[in-house]
Structure formats: C-alpha cells, structure tokens
Amino acid sequence: MAKKKAVNKRTSTSTPKLPAKKTVVRKSTKRSPAAVQSELKKLDREIVKLVNKRCAMTIKQIKSDPEPRKAMFDPKSDEELRENIEKFNASGPLTNNAVRGVFRQILSSARRQIHPQRVAYLGPAYSYTHLAALERFGEGADMVPVNTIGAVFEEVNRGNTEFGVVPIENSTDGRVVDTLDMFTRLPLRICGEVLIAIHHNLLARCERSQITEIYSKPQALSQCREWLARNMPQAHLHEVTSTSTAAQLAATKPGAAAVASHQASVEYDLQIIVEGIEDNANNVTRFAVIGEEVCDPTGSDRTAILVQIAHTAGSLADTLQIFKKNKVNLTWIESFP
C-alpha cells in the first residue's frame, strides 16, 4: 500500500507592502494684511475713477437735453435707475437701499455743478421731512428749512425754491390736514413722492427716571401714544412744530426728552433712551414733492386730483362715475374740509 506524503500547509506571516505615501503640499489661501490693503487700494482707485466718470456722464446727459433744468428732476429716469440697481445688485452683499444711496449722491453732485436745486422742507435739520428731502434730492441740493407746512408751499409759490417736501399721509394717523389745506390755497402740483419708514425714539440727556417733559410734533406723539401711556405716565407731553424742534428743547431743558429720529440724536448730541417706541412697527409716512410744473409720466405713476363739487344730492356719486366709466381705480379719497 503506497504511503501518502504529508503536506504541511503554512500560513504566510509576511506583511504586504503598502503603497508609498504621497506628500500633499497645500498652499494657504490666507492673505497677508499688506496684500489685502494693497488690493483695497487698487479697488478704491478704480471706484473713485468710475464714480467720477459716472458723474461726468450725468452732467453731459443733462446739458445735452433740450430742457436742462427740467432734466435735472426726471422721475422717469430715476425710476429706470432704481429698476437697474435691483437687477444689477442681485448678488449683494450691499442692500439695494445702500447702492441707491451711492447713486443718489453721484446724481446730486452732478446736478449741483449745473444748477444747485433749492428745496424747502419742514425743519429744523434732521426732521423726518428733512430726511425725506435728502432721500429724494441728495446732499448736493440746497436745503431750506422753514417752520410750517404752509411756509414750504409759500417758498415754492414765490419762486424762492424750485421744490418743497411736505408730509401728506401717515399709515397710522392718515391724512396731514395742513398739507391738504395748502393745496386748496395755492396752485402747486405734486411732482413726486417719498416713502419713509418712521421709527421714533425717546431721546434725552438725562436718565429715563429723570424725564418729566416729553416734546414732539402732534403726529409723532399720536403714533407713540400707547407706549408713552404705558411706560412714561408721569411725563407731561408737549406739542411742537417738528421732531427736530423737540430735539433742540431736549438738548437744552433739564428733565426734557424728545420723540424724534436717530439722526436727530446725533445732530443734537442726545442719548437714545429707548429705541423704536412707535405703536405700529410698520409706521410709514408718505411725503409729497411739490413744484410748479407737471413732470413727464414714468409709466407707474399716481395721479392726485383736487375737485370741488356742488353741495347737492348725488354730486359725489356722479363724479365717481367718471372714474368707473374710464376704468380708473381710486386708492385714496379725502373729503376736505
């Protein structure tokens, strides 16, 4: 019988060779402060160059117009610019309002070099009407503060200023009676409008517990009446002609405070004791730009019509039928007085 050979099976204990490690060299993406500063300097140089080029082109455009003075206030062109900014600024990080602010100053400076526009507004400086005027005309315009809404109309009517800015309606308090009254007295026209979000602040130079008097214009006090009743019941409320006048008083009278804007706190060196005290967080005021001439249509306009009708039954209904017949929608109707 044949013998079977024994076969010993051994398990290999040798270690397999691993692939050689590759050394990866990563370049740092962090730039030195000096490199960043150098890049910023290049950008600043280019921005200044482009801003001046835009200003020069605006001057050239206005001067080439058959009516240069009229071209300086062109709502249609301004509307097109607003639409372009929203389209070009889709990626940010600047907000559309911030970019519009840059262009506003460019256009305002260009117009000033041709003819400084004079604009009357309900003052003093940094009232809400002043802020609305700056929003529309920029800092290149000559701003003329006056003490009353009626005085704004008079300045424009006498030719002392080309335009005026007045409040016409508030989302909380409704119509501004003084403005509507002046439209019945003087033959001026609405040339444009400015919408301003109104955020009231309690301003003072003393501690909150030391406030005994609060000043502001009637509309501002009305828009904060609930907050003031809850939080400042011990303080006496006083009506003045504007929020800026209130800020001036708060800056000079012991124990006095004002309901006014953030900008007023800076202008009159006041502390913001409480921010945003308006009862309605969506508090918006519509300001009218008034002048003597009718502006060209932009395609997205509002039209204001002042009519006087007979004091007879059905006269108002007959007037409204004209709008219905011509398929014109009405968004605001006021009976005055």
Task: Locate each region found by the language model.
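Domain-level signature for soluble enzymes in the chorismate/prephenate branch of the shikimate pathway
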Residues: 2-337
